[in-house]
């Protein structure tokens, strides 16, 4: 070892011991002095790592979910009239933009407004969504170079813009030119919200008329009109006739004999009437339900009048003339290229069910209400008066409704002494006989 290396080692050792001695002279205990290795000596990295201390660190406090500011919640408080409509919602958004010029906390406010839209009934209004997008500052979140476009530039703001577009997609709201212009001003063309908009414009136009049985956007509020729409939606026969057997009566109506009287609306086609007239009176028919039918966000419950399937030996097979048979036309087609292993038939599992004679939508699902429907059907179907009708009713939640015999409470059991006396009397009578 040269003399220069020896001098450097001695100087480093003196500095390390000098630091320890100086802290000891100030009154600190020796156990609390941090270990300081000489600068010239080699030591492991664990000696300098603060995590290797034997003293446990306090646990980090759990992160709480981010909540909207109380100031934003006050903007959506109901007005003096208490009405939650589009005017009050737009007023709350305008108050935020007027009193918050720098638009601090605009992301939290937009998330809060998206949650409040269903309460105010504006979740399907395109102008309200454009009003929320207009809250974003313009020309601030646009990418300035290629790296901003590759990586998620201003991720929280872009995720908020995507959330607005996703809620529009969930409610079937088609963006327009104003929506596209706002996104170009806010995030630019090469951004994720703009990519979401392009995808929505592509698929919305293709799936707009994909449903062969479309449902109107605004459903009627009247239960009778809603029931008629549901029945027309279920019945494929255009010649079927919708009949209102009973109109609902208001509870405050003075002329109402029964204030709980509900609506009864039914539908039946001429083919169903002829099938019911040919039905065997010895076989009962059944009233089953309620079954659910969803029309957008409204659920309608309906009942059916049906019969069991006839056994195979009693079915009447309708003979079709050979020249009318479309399945086996009068021509000979010999396919010589086919072999015995070629099978062009599809395996279709068809479940045969009994005939359905009528469908009904009623406000109540009890037997008394449905009996009025059967009485109304007897006016146009006289054969129904001779056919026994059995009610198979179940609850709306899938639970079976108890019958009238199950609702009656069983008689209380007799006392024990009385049972023994009755048994002894029966034995004496049997012995005398």
UniProtKB/Swiss-Prot annotation:
GO molecular function, one term: molecular adaptor activity
Keyword Cell inner membrane in annotation: no
Posttranslational modification: Ubiquitinated on Lys-372; leading to translocation in the nucleus together with RELA and NFKB1 and expression of NF-kappa-B-dependent genes.
Subcellular compartments: Cytoplasm; Nucleus; Mitochondrion
InterPro entries registered for this protein in UniProt: ECIST_C, ECSIT, ECSIT_N
Keywords for the protein's UniProt record, in alphabetical order: Cytoplasm, Immunity, Innate immunity, Isopeptide bond, Mitochondrion, Nucleus, Transit peptide, Ubl conjugation
Transit peptide: 1-48
Full protein name: Evolutionarily conserved signaling intermediate in Toll pathway, mitochondrial
């Amino acid at each position: 070892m040269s003399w220069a290396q020896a001098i450097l080692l001695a100087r480093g050792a003196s500095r390390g011991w000098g630091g320890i001695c100086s802290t000891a002279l100030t009154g600190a205990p020796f156990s609390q002095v941090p270990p300081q290795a000489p600068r010239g000596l080699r030591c492991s990295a664990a000696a300098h790592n603060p995590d290797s201390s034997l003293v446990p660190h306090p646990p980090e406090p759990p992160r709480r979910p981010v909540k909207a500011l109380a100031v934003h919640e006050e903007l959506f408080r109901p007005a003096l009239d208490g009405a939650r409509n589009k005017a009050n919602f737009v007023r709350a958004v305008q108050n935020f933009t007027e009193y918050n010029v720098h638009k601090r906390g605009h992301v939290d406010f937009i998330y809060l407004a998206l949650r409040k839209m269903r309460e105010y009934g504006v979740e399907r209004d395109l102008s309200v969504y454009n009003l929320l997008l207009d809250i974003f500052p313009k020309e601030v979140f646009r990418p300035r170079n290629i790296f901003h476009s590759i990586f998620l530039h201003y991720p929280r703001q872009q995720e908020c813009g995507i959330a607005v577009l996703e809620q529009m997609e969930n409610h079937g709201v088609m963006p327009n030119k104003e929506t596209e212009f706002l996104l170009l001003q806010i995030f630019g063309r090469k951004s994720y919200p703009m990519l979401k908009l392009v995808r929505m414009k592509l698929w919305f136009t293709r799936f707009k008329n994909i449903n062969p049985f479309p449902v109107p956007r605004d459903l009627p509020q009247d239960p009778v009109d809603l029931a008629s729409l549901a029945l027309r939606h279920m019945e494929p026969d255009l010649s079927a006739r919708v009949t209102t057997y009973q109109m609902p009566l208001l509870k405050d109506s003075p002329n109402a004999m029964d204030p709980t009287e509900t609506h009864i609306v039914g539908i039946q086609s001429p083919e169903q009437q002829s099938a019911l007239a040919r039905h065997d009176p010895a076989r009962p028919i059944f009233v089953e339900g309620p079954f659910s039918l969803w029309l957008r966000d409204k659920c309608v419950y309906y009942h059916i009048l049906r019969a069991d399937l006839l056994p195979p030996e009693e079915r009447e097979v309708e003979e079709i003339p050979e020249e009318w048979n479309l399945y086996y036309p009068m021509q000979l087609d010999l396919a010589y290229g086919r072999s015995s292993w070629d099978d062009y038939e599809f395996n279709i599992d068809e479940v045969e069910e009994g005939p359905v004679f009528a469908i009904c939508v009623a406000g109540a699902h009890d037997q008394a209400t449905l009996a009025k429907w059967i009485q109304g059907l007897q006016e146009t179907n006289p054969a129904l008066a001779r056919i026994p009708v059995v009610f198979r009713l179940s609850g709306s939640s899938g639970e079976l409704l108890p019958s009238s015999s199950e609702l009656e409470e069983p008689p209380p059991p007799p006392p024990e002494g009385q049972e023994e006396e009755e048994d002894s009397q029966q034995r004496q009578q049997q012995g005398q006989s």
